Amino acid sequence: MSQALPVRDQGRDQGIFAGTLPPAPPKFKWTRLDTYTWAIIAVFALVTRFTGLSSATASGTPVFDEKHYVPQAWDMVRSWINPITGGIESNPGYGLVVHPPLAKQLEALGEWVFGYTPLGWRIMVAIFGTLTIFAIMAIARRLSGSTMVTFIAGILALADGVLLVSSRFGMLDIFLVFFITAAAWALIRDHQQMHQRLNDLLLTNGQITKDFGPRFGFRWWRFTTGVFLGLALSVKWSGLYYIAFFGLTSVFLDLWLRKRYGVRRYVTGTLKNDVIPALGSLVIIPALLYIWSWRAWFASETSVYRHAKTDGTITEDSILQLFPESIAGWIHYHISVLEFHGSLTTSSGHSHPWDSKPWAWLVSGRPILYFSSTDISCDVGGTCRRMIYLFGTPAIWWLTVPVILWALWSFFARRSRGYVVPLVAFAAGFLPWLAAYDRQMYFFYATALVPFTIIMLALACGELWGRGKMTPTGLTRGSMAVVTYISLVVMMFLAFSPLFYGFVIPDYVYESLMWFPSWR
């Protein structure tokens, strides 16, 4: 009889606050089945992300904010300084560039190779969309130790409409999502490595003798976490939220390990040995990488606000007059961007037909129309249309709240640590937007939520697998529920795929897919 799969080394942990000794960290041995699993997902990822990439819209017409980012990336190609520095956004005709440059620098690589073409401005998002699936699977494998859970996470990531559409258009969000997901993976690797070091020390000495516990030494995985967080920040300022949430989580996990392994003064030990190195890796490193992403702006004499001090843009009584020319201009640029974001509120008259608020994101309640072509002649009679929506597969998004509640219950009631990082990452992408509720927002802000919803769903499926009585199919009721759910996700993905890919469909098919008025 098959058994339920635990969240490996993260399951029922009755001693989490009792100081009992934890089990040894899990070992992750790569098997032939892992190779087959990842290869299958890789093939489908490439097919779903790259098929028709250059013709996703009529003649490759830019959609939504592609109209901003595509020419900005092309500016970088045209103003290329050298291979290391790259180029700048010259700001012709579209006002202030309000996002950091990294994502557009990456898109510029595609345009440099393939020219100012749809393939050129979409190839890099497709690559990073594929890598995001692998990052999701890597986290699921690390938390579960299960090839099956990894495979489930891969299927769910393949079948989500938000991840798919975000991987096929030259927007910024898929770059942010990849770097955040990769940072979460590195954070988990760091925690598991520290667990292993303490376990080895315990086996060697029989106890952790120091009052404050040991120093962990240089932590390359924590450093890697900081690198990915810095890259996320260099795509969008919302990366700041993840720096704060992941930084606190890293310190909390260190404190927990010290307490769990019997360190007497574990709080002081954490403050003494862990906090300063964590600040270095998770705050200083991201800040340095963020500044590095602006290297072309500093290198060019024609960058926007590059000479704001001497041309009078910065007033004589400003404190920025105390700074060197380039630093003053750079700070003034950031102040201007901050003022823009602060003024982009619903109450100040900035409304948009596809505006949405965070509570609606939890159920994909207000998607975004990216492309529309109607009144197309149909062979079946009547008229047809092509529509592309940024839209979440309902069978995934409608379980967002239930799986979060399950994860919270698993952590607080069953002491299951496997859900900690996914929960923290989801909170970092959701809670800060509640504080800015009046701001103009769009559903693509929620793109960073779905990887962690998928991971929690995959972990929950792993725990359900093997539970219950055996059925005539040879599977338990729990296993049948998992198979049924995965089948439902795939069927929904196929049913809504015309809205993801922009297939020509009769009007009545389109109407049958518009289940709610808010989807229109």
From Swiss-Prot:
Q: What is its EC number?
A: 2.4.1.-
Q: What topology in the membrane does the UniProt record assign?
A: Multi-pass membrane protein
What keywords would UniProt list here?
Cell membrane, Glycosyltransferase, Membrane, Transferase, Transmembrane, Transmembrane helix
One Gene Ontology molecular-function label: dolichyl-phosphate-mannose-protein mannosyltransferase activity
Location(s) in or outside the cell: Cell membrane
Question: Looking at the keywords, is Cytoplasm present?
Answer: no
- Cross-referenced InterPro entries: GlyclTrfase_39-like, Glyco_trans_39/83, PMT_4TMC
Q: Which GO terms describe its cellular component?
A: plasma membrane
Pathway(s) per entry:
Protein modification; protein glycosylation
Q: Where are the transmembrane segments?
A: 38-58, 119-139, 145-165, 168-188, 237-257, 274-294, 388-408, 418-438, 441-461, 485-505
Superkingdom of this entry's organism?
A: Bacteria
What the entry lists under Pfam families is as follows: PMT (PF02366), PMT_4TMC (PF16192)
Could you say what a knockout of this gene produces? Loss of protein glycosylation.
**Biological function:** Protein O-mannosyltransferase that catalyzes the transfer of a single mannose residue from a polyprenol phospho-mannosyl lipidic donor to the hydroxyl group of selected serine and threonine residues in acceptor proteins.
The family note in this entry says: Belongs to the glycosyltransferase 39 family.
Q: What is this protein called?
A: Polyprenol-phosphate-mannose--protein mannosyltransferase
Protein source organism: Corynebacterium glutamicum (strain ATCC 13032 / DSM 20300 / JCM 1318 / BCRC 11384 / CCUG 27702 / LMG 3730 / NBRC 12168 / NCIMB 10025 / NRRL B-2784 / 534)
The gene name reads: pmt
